[in-house]
Amino acid sequence: EFLAREKVVLFEPAIRIGDFFIRIDVLVKDGNSFELIEVKAKSYNSVKPELFGARGGIRSDMLPYFQDAAFQSWVLRQAFPGSVIKTFLMMPDKAQVAPIAGINQMFRILPDRQVETTIPPGVDGKALAEHLLAKVDVTPSVNDILASPIEFPGGPLPFADAARLWAKHYANDEPV
């Protein structure tokens, strides 16, 4: 198993523990430390970040992304107790200007909705991605979500209790 290695970078690793199953977009393991990176298509402005509303809470349009990352972080903690987990959202940075012309020509959407990527000779795809993508540390917000009760009909419940309740209902094909 790749996660038994001391250092590894995995793309879309599947992690299952009990009734919980997740696929993390990118997972970087270094000893007992993890970087959980969720890649989102929603754009982000690194010059004028707008993740939080006027009153300091996570904006409603961003909340599902944070909650998804929080759930994945929680499951990863269950699978690797005592580990250190930093959680990131990676999003296109609309404050950046592409350093080459015709970047849109590098991506083609196929009839089955898959995306085909063609990187021309001489173009460093990794450097291009690092320039155009923002890796935003959301660890403090994820920790706040995990420490706060989840409001739902029948709730509120602590995050872990709500997750276990929903997993039980899902496993038994019962409504929540």
Where are these regions (language model features)?
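Cysteine-cluster motifs in flexible loop/terminal segments that predominantly coordinate metals
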Residues: 153, 157-176
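Mg2+/Mn2+-dependent nuclease catalytic core
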Residues: 6-152
